[in-house]
Structures are given as C-alpha cells and as structure tokens.
Amino acid sequence: MAGLLVPTAALPASAAAATATTAWQNGSFHVDTPNVVRRSDIVLGKPNSAGAQSLPLGNGSLGTAVWAANGFTAQLNRSDTLPGRKSPGQVTIPGLSKMTGAADFKGYLDLYTGVLNESGGGMTLKAWVSATKDELVVDVTGADPNAAQSASVSLWSGRSPQAAASGAIGTLAETWVDNQEAGSSGRTFGSLAALSAGGRGVSAQVVNSTQVKVNFTPNADGSFRVIAGAPTWTGGSAGSTASALLGSDAAAAESSLLSTQQSWWANYWANSGILEANSSDGQAQYMETLRTIYLFMEAASMRGAIPGSQAGVADMFNFGQDHQNWTPSATWLWNLRTQISANMSSGNFALNIPIFNLYQNNLPAIEAWTKQQMGGLPGACVPEVMRFNGNGGDPSPGANAACSRPGSPNWNALDVTSGAEISLYVWQQYQDTGDVNFLRTYYPLMRDSATFLLAYQKVGSDGKLHAVANAHETQWAVQDPTTDLAADAALFPAVVSAAKLLNTDTSLQTQLTTALGQIPPWARTDYGHTQVLPPSADSSNNDVIAWSYQPTATTRNGENIDLEPVWPYNLITDDPGALHDLAVRTYNHRVFYGAGNDWNMDAIDAARLGMASEVASRLVAITQAHQVYINGLSDLGSSVGTEGYIEQLSGVATALDEALVQDYDGTLRIAPAWPAGWDVSGTVAVQGNTRVNVQVQGGSPVTVAIQAGSSRTMKVRNPWPGKAVQVVNGSGNAVVVSSTTATTFDVPVVSGQSYLVEQVAAPTTALPYAQVSGSPATTARHLGTVQIGIDGSGGTPGNGSVVSFKAHANGDYVTADNAGAAPLIANRTAIGPWEQFDLIDQGNGSVALRAHANDKYVTADNAGADPLLAKVTAVGTWEQFQLVHNGDGSVSLKSMINGDYVTAENAGADPLIANRTTIGPWEEFDLIDD
C-alpha cells in the first residue's frame, strides 16, 4: 500500500454549499420517488443481442433474463425447481426481429414499474413479470396485422418434459426426484412452462419433445400479446394448471394488467429507503444506480418460498439454461450477508423472510445433522454451506461437508459460527422492526445456535473458553479463531436479551452471562502474521488482529477474518480508543488488499471505522474489477459466464447505507463515513421501526430528520461536532432538546412523530425548500471501463479501438506532436495519424493510450508533474487513466498516478498535463471513434 490510512473527521459544517436546500417541509421528507428511481433505469441504445446483456424481470418467485436474440428471448427461472434450480424454459418471439433489427431501436428497463420498454421499426414492446402471479407478459404494437406470428417455449438436451398443446395453450411439464446428491431429500420437484397468446386465430402445437409453439395473427390494429406462465410444479394436470394460471390474461386490457403491476411496485418503492447521490466525476451517481438496481433485483427475486440467491449468484436472472456456478441445492451464508444487511437498512425486511425461513424451518434437520456430525453435541451447528433440506452435505470422513468433524480439515467442516451469524441478523431485524412475533418465531434458531457454541467450546485452565475450529474458510482447524470469539461476544448477549423479552430460558441466560466473561481477548499479531502477541502490544501501535491464535497456519481463502469483529459482528466501533486504533491498523495492513472477490467488504469495514475516502475508493475499485454485465451484475472474478452475481450490488448498497447512517450499537451516527465531494439525499431504516432522512450538500449535513416508529429515547451523535445543535419537532418546530454542543445527546421520541436535528445557528427550517428530484436515465451510465446499459451511436469505443480527442478548450484535436517526440497538445483542426490513439483496457477500471505517431504509450510524465508524452513501450501506473464520462457526452481523463484530471492547459495553447482536481471545459474532450 502507498501509505497508511486514518479515519477522516466528521464532515465540517463550514463546507456546506451556500445554496443548500432541504427537502423537509410540513413534517415530511419530500422525494419525487418515481423519477429518483428512474435515474437508474437501464438504457439500451442498441439491442442487447447476447444473453450476457440480458435484463432482469421478476416478481420474487418467477425471474426472467430477457435479451434480443431471435427477436426476443426470455429465460424463465425459479428458485424451487430443486435441487438443480432448473429453468422451466426459454421463450422466443421471432417476429420481434423487425423491431430489434431496426436502425432506430431503443429501449429501457423502467425500474419503478418493472416494465421493459422497447421500440424500433414502427413496433413497440412492453414486457413484465406480473407482480401478482407467475407469468411473463409481452405486449406488442405496430406489427403487420396480416403477417403470421409465433412464439415458442423450449428446453434443451438433458431435459425430458411432457410437451402438450390444447387449444391456445402449450405446456412443457417435467418432474424429478431429489435422490442423486448426498443428503438428498427424496422429494419430488419439477418445472412447468405454459405458453399462450392474444391475437387472432391462436392455436398451440407441439413442435418436438422439448418445444411447444403458439401460432397467431396480430389483432387488426397490429397489436398482440404473448404470455408465459411458470408456477411451482410438482406434478398433476399441466393443462388444467396452465389454464387456471393464465386465465383470461391473453385477452385482458393492458391497462388492467399494468394497474396491479404499477400499484405493487409503487408501494414497494414508497416503503423502500431511496437514495440519490451526485458527484462531479459521476462516481456517486454510478453507486446510486447500483444500489437502486439492487433494490429492484432483490424484490424481483427474493419473495419465493426458497431464497432466489444461494451463493451470491443472481440465480433468478440466469441466462445460461441450466448451468449453475455453484451447487444449486446449497446456500452459502457468507454470500448472503450483504443482501440481508441491505434489505434491513433499506427497510425491506420482508425480503429476508425466505432466508430466515430456510434456517428456522430446517432447525430439526440441522439439530439432527449436528448430533450426527459434531459428536452428539446439543443445539444447532448451522452449516455454512447448507442444503435446502437442512444438512451439510456428504457425511463421509474427509468429505467436503459443513459442520462435520469427520470432514475436517476442510473448507467448512469446522466453520461453527454460521448459526451465530444468521441469529444475529434475526436479532437485528427484531431491533429494527420491534416485531415481537417475528422474534418469537425465530428465537429457537438463536437459542439453539448459542446452545451449540456453549457445548462446543470448553473452559481451559486459564478460565477462558477454547476450541479448535475454522477461521471461516481462511484457516482450517485452528485454535480460537477470531470468528468464534466474535460470535460468542455478539450472540450471547443478544440471546440473553431475546430470552428476557420472551420470558424464557432462564438457565440458558445464566450460562450465557457466565460465558461472556470467559471469552479470550482478540488474538494479536504483527503485520506479517508471524506470531501471537499479547493485548499489551497495542501500546506499540504496530500490532493487528490475527485470524486466530495460530496466525501462521496455512491460508486457504482470501477473507479478511481479522475485520469480522468490525462487521458484521458489530463489536468494534468508530469510537476513539485503543480498540478502534487496533482495528484501523488491521484494516490498513489487511492481508487481502485490492479488488479480491466480488463480495469484498472493504468499503463496509471502512464505513464502520469512519474512513470516508476508503469507502469511495473501494466501492469504485471493486465495481470496476468485477462488474462485467450491463445490468449491473458482477462476476466472482472478472469473466462473463452464464449467470451474474448479485453480491457486489448488495455490498455497494450496504456500504452506502452504512456510510450515511449507522445505529448498530444504539448510537445514531449521521454521515459517519460519507465520501467528501458526494452530495446525497437518502433514507435509512434504523432501530425502533424508525426511518432517518439525511441530506449532505457541499460536504456537510443539511437535513437530519428522524421519523419515529416507536416511543423511546434515542442516543444521537452530534452531526456537527463541536457545534451547538438542537432537536425540534418536525411538524411544529417545538424544541425537544435544547441547544447543546455535547458529542452525544438523548432524544425522547414518540411513535408517529418526526424530529429535526439541526444547528442552532443554521436551522434546517430556514433553508429554501426543494424536494429530492430526478430525471429518468436516457443513456447508458459509465464508470471507467464498466457500464450499465448499452450505448447507442457515440458511446465508448470497444477495447483496442482507434480514437481521437477533440478538446472543449479550443475545439482542436489532440496530437502527439512531432511524431510523438513533443508533448501532447490540442492544436490540430483535422485527424491524421498523429491524432489517433489505440484505447486499451487495462482491466482495472483504467485505460491506456497508444499513439499511432510512434506506437508508444502516453505517460503522465514525472508522476504527472510534467506534460503528457507518448514515450514508453509498456504500461505502468503513469500510463493509466480513468475514462470519465461527463453529463454532456464528453469525456475526461483522470490520471491514475496522481488522481488529477488531464487539462488542455491555457485554453489549449499549452501541452496537456494532469494537474486539475475538478472538471471544467479545459478538462473535457469529445471522444471520436475513428
């Protein structure tokens, strides 16, 4: 690393923009929700002809990936076609090739309604998955009313459906038994695809054993509709089930079908914490877009009986037939943690219920597995990799099972903290909602997870609890892993509190209270992880948290286990002190530094530690390293496959919410790590069924509003450190907390009331009013070399393209003057070889420029202190630039060596040099694809 990082101070009030406004008025926080959400619409300037360019539609139990191959292709996906999560089929509508092949094609996914809109060649399309039933609806206008049309649904080699046709409905139905894998359930599962159409003369036919088709003529006005249903299916009458599902929808008025669709999604967004962010370089807008897309995808995939994601993968938007990246019958909790967290902080608690049910409903099976595989111990050792029916896989000695002593040493054999982790999420969701019935339902999972940990760990001669276990997947079978210590310290008091609330398990409460005093201190080690150090080593300021009490044990995976106490276990805060300093050192010297995997949690850890600049830089770096799909989904590495990962999106959503608002330990923190230079208006759900609305403008909070959902006393950290603040009623402005400069203060709140935390010298109510507003996206959005959507003409050229740059400073083209021997300068009125450059993707979110003048790479010479010059034969950091897309369609170049923007100095009269911190006309260039 270039240097050590320290937490940034809280945002200064003096930095607030002179034109600050507030969206708070008359007791409410005003957001133009439809248009703020639509800022993140996914825009198609060209047809998304490849499956890897597919767009997501779904209702939570039926998901689809939609792209333009064969006119229109949609793969149907469900989470309950177990154990393989097999697709019910792919729908194609070849007659839409006229639209997708037209020169004027364009489209966009409206995230606010969940409707895909496309047009071209005089035709239009609207496609959506009904919010209220498991069917895909495709409405078309502008077709030739006299030309025959068709639609088909197909399966592929390896599938054995029963294909049938009756009247206007065709079906593909298949069942199978879960009896092939270790730990199989013996249950019957299956898939059913039902296809019909609205038009004239609709008739279904069986094409072959894996394909059915509907033939029809459009209505007289050139309109037609295709509907494809895919419900839960375990056998029965396919025809009757299909007929009952589709009903009269083929002929129903579009307005009637869309009204329920629009109503459901409008209600969803109205109850979600919306966030709008802006920065001059577009990074904040890009992160906002990823978060909004995440909220859409989560609602479109996580409302079924089985979680729609099981290994960080967006299974419900698979476009690769039945191919799955990971064992589709199993769930990895590690890869769900940021989804669970983001669902809570955005207020979408219902989306976590399928996950919680997976564990609670399987609790008897988990306990049986624990007794069988963990030496007869009581309680629940929840398998980190758990099959949908509650076991850890193959029980054989040496097998790669989870919670399995016979399987140790192995990836998850002695990973014993997953029960504690899922239990903590249950407790946190209770704290956020105050729903006692929810807590009562899932408390057994908490109780049994704690019971197991008590039994698994033994008190040693030092009076402390000890065990040999995995440090998750990073160290196997080591002494006292940090994950175990964190699980004990976080879970035990939560279970005690829950048991007291429910008036139960007094004996367990006593045991857990005793055990809390028996947890060993965090293992410390040196920066090289070569030895165990005592807690007293903290005084030297050169120790870090170790992964376990065996720091030199073999490293198996790339997880920063030493930061688990920070998040998700919530045990080390940003409060000043030796423990916080230890955690900051641990972050700065973490072994796995860089983009790593797409589930990288650096930005979340940085937010918890108050390291605002790291939040921004890590979000950008991880996104540029892993987002490989135009719908915002990522890859575990950086390759395009057959289904994307959603866990990078959820990591962004979690980090943004944590940077804006935190209250995990009962102290409400406002913008504790919000990046400088990013303005934001957002709402975050916190404890007590409460929402907090925050606006940061010009580097300072300008609106802090609490909308209380319960009556209690809230502890609030002063958003303007050292400044006099007060709290007033959000409707009547009556003073609730008088002027104070205290670091933290108590705010008594009443359910249903709102409160403004404001500076005495600059009250929120004195600011001019402006609602949080936005405009629907009209073009693809870019972040360096990654993008959301597809450009039309004038978009970013592909890797290796020949480009030129036209300076806004003077309207001239940039040249590698004197055949490249002189610095780059914008002084040519036409493009020749000296004005042409190869644009080469560097794979890390940056590009390099190779001059045609001399076939050498452009460098920000002398670490950016000297003008740009085409003089080197290999690419290093001096030769890397981030390609920034500006709102007016121009681009800017940000040097990776010094972080400054390239400018056409002196209105273009002087050579190009990277020495500007902000973008103005001199830093803007038109990118010409030669």
What role is predicted for each listed range?
Residues 5-20:
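C-terminal region of N-terminal signal peptides and the immediate post-cleavage residues
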Residues 77, 85-93, 646-693, 697:
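Catalytic cores of secreted or luminal carbohydrate-active enzymes
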Residues 148-158, 705-721:
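Surface-exposed beta-strand/loop patches in extracellular or lumenal glycoproteins
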Residues 332-339, 344-368, 376-380, 410-432, ...:
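Active-site core of glycosidic bond-cleaving carbohydrate-active enzymes
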Residues 131-140, 689-717:
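Carbohydrate-binding surface patches
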Residues 1-3, 7-8, 795-930:
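Lectin-like carbohydrate-binding module/patch detector with strong preference for beta-trefoil
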Residues 18-51, 57, 61-329, 349-353, ...:
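Acidic/polar, glycine-enriched structural segments that form the non-catalytic walls/loops
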